[in-house]
């Protein structure tokens, strides 16, 4: 019995800083063979004091899901090309982090300062379909995408307008908003247009136009829905130059990765000046 256990090949995995192991399955494997290797590997990892065991299964190895679940694994998250399962094998409390809990969205207040008009759209589908509501261009920030670049991308995709990010004006948090489970973080941003001729994204946008800010604010929908009323008020104050938002300050993490801090626009300017002066003195 012991000799047979020694002959069973263990699954190869990459250890992490939290006494965990991630197994990335690549080669096709019979589910019974996989079960034997998994059992032997789990026994080995317990002896080593490992805690969280992750198994990454590509679409082509979906036949191994049932076997993994039978050995105590549970779903953690899925992407288009793989499923991630996890099992906590330690006697200590389970500290496996939850799956991603938030989706980040952004709305764009694009201001034409010459005419005091803002860019608005009517959508072909979704919540606002057939409601005759003119709304700001909005969209979801992609994985690995910064808020300030994502909101500009959405504006160009929906309207053809090229615009530069200026500030984050406000943000709101809404629970159970995505798939009745995930939390939606929505950032209201102001952008400055570099072009003014509109080309609607026919697949999503019914029509788009430049609208006087007061007309946007006075829409019945904005009047009767408090959250939209507050957002519209912030937009109006920004158009009247009576509101200061959060600008970006480029920086780097301790590992050298590029990152951005969002802070009061006035203070952001001071931080940039201070950094430039320090760089000039080197």
Swiss-Prot record:
Expressed in stems, leaves, roots, flowers and siliques. Keywords: Cell membrane, Cytoplasm, Hydrolase, Magnesium, Membrane, Metal-binding, NAD, Nucleus. Disruption phenotype: Growth retardation, constitutive pathogen resistance phenotype and increased levels of reactive oxygen species and NADH. Its cofactor is Mg(2+). Residues 101-233 form the Nudix hydrolase domain. GO terms for cellular component: cytoplasm; nucleus; plasma membrane. It is an enzyme of class 3 (hydrolase). Changing residue 154 to Q: Loss of hydrolase activity. Gene3D superfamilies: 3.40.630.30, Nucleoside Triphosphate Pyrophosphohydrolase (3.90.79.10). Optimum pH is 8.5. Optimum temperature is 50 degrees Celsius. InterPro entries: NUDIX_hydrolase-like_dom_sf, Nudix_hydrolase6-like, NUDIX_hydrolase_CS, NUDIX_hydrolase_dom, Pre-Nudix. Disulfide bonds: none annotated. It is found in: Nucleus; Cytoplasm; Cell membrane. One of its GO terms (molecular function) is metal ion binding. It holds the Pfam family Nudix_hydro. Induction: Rapid and transient induction by biotic and abiotic stresses. Not induced by H(2)O(2). Its EC number is 3.6.1.-, 3.6.1.13, 3.6.1.22. It comes from the Eukaryota. Homodimer. Interacts with RACK1A, GG1 and GG2. Belongs to the Nudix hydrolase family. This is Nudix hydrolase 7. It comes from Arabidopsis thaliana (Mouse-ear cress). The gene is NUDT7.
